[in-house]
Amino acid sequence: MYRLIQNGQLLIDDQLVKRDIAIDEKGRITAIEAQITPTDEPTETIFDAQGALVSAGLIDGHVHFRDPGFTDKETLQTGSQAAAHGGYTSVIAMPNLNPVPDNLSDFKTLVARNQTETSVHTYQFAPITGDLVNNDLVDMPAFKAAGAAGFTNDGHGVQDAQTMYLAMQQAAAIDAPIVAHVEDISLVNGGVIHDGAAAKRLNVPGIPSVSESAQVARDIELARATGVHYHICHISTKETVALVRRAKADGVNITCEVTPHHLLLDDRSIISDDTMLKMNPPLRTLADRQSLWAGLMDGTIDVIATDHAPHTAAEKSQSLLQAPFGIVGSETAFSLLYTHLVVNGPFSLAQLLAKMTTVPAQVFNLPAAGQLRVGDQADIAVFNLTQPTTIQATDFQSKGHNTPFIGETVLGGTELTLVAGQVAYQRSK
């Protein structure tokens, strides 16, 4: 446990300013000052940040820890260690597990395991319906009382409008968000990548943009009618951005997220049968990606979430038609985004950090997270903004190495992550 972080750079009023941070034995921040003189207490341990960025720990509203049911892909331990490696101190896990925690007993067990078996604060979404695919709603008030951060069938869109309408009514009544994977399965037609030039060239079925935007349009009207907080997962199309922008202007209680891979890649990258580029929703067109950047800049898109989705090497070694959707992202998100959006792009560091700290804390109602404040628990990430590093699978804490970004050189690697003052990750020297 570190009791003092010295020589850090905090972002204050869009400027990096030298600050020291003192932490007490309970893991709470006791002082943030230009200079804090170390005491002579033998329990005090000092971390010299050496001019690195010291930030509030990042918040990821969309991770898949695969535990229980798919522990060959990930476990609570490895998934949370991967999050800590990426500078995340709070995450919200998806319920597409085996068994699906759609009964109160299983859900309570999972919440308890999240609290005792993970390296970071791990919150849990509950399913909207039984088994994620039927039309029987879970007991939302009971699940919220048991700790549900919201309700989602992630991995599946809610296909029946009446089911979604009733779910939104119940969620609105208990002030809980509906977190939607938006996908009209009747329009997907077995697609594996975006329905565009790459799909035609590779002769594989494509997923049309309207499979996303059609369900978004439906759900916006249901959200308007019910007043629920409606949050859209991993948006990918320019049509969705336009729909969300219009809905926000109309006063609909709507938020949304975008992933790093949808910001950084498009379907021009798919030149072969490369399953590291297979995810759901798929990589769309350059025009879609440009719209995502614009939406992130103007506030239409609220937060960045990784959709960290580990799979085994054997699964991802199959063809595009057979391999599962998804890539890992927890360990690379900040460094990739800092390098491409800030250093080589139009975003400021303040804008990037807001989308990964303060705004997700607001969107997901985590008032103790997302800021560095005296009296709060010391959830802290330290990033080296000047030293280039190469993304290597051998450095990953996750069981999953399925990412197209292996080998890329980035800035912004994680030096240290503290969760409630305890070391969750520290880079080896």
From Swiss-Prot:
The keyword Cytoplasm does not apply. Pfam families: Amidohydro_1 (PF01979). GO terms for biological process: 'de novo' UMP biosynthetic process; purine nucleobase catabolic process. Pathway: Pyrimidine metabolism; UMP biosynthesis via de novo pathway; (S)-dihydroorotate from bicarbonate: step 3/3. It is an enzyme of class 3 (hydrolase). Belongs to the metallo-dependent hydrolases superfamily. DHOase family. Class I DHOase subfamily. This is Dihydroorotase. It comes from Latilactobacillus sakei subsp. sakei (strain 23K) (Lactobacillus sakei subsp. sakei).
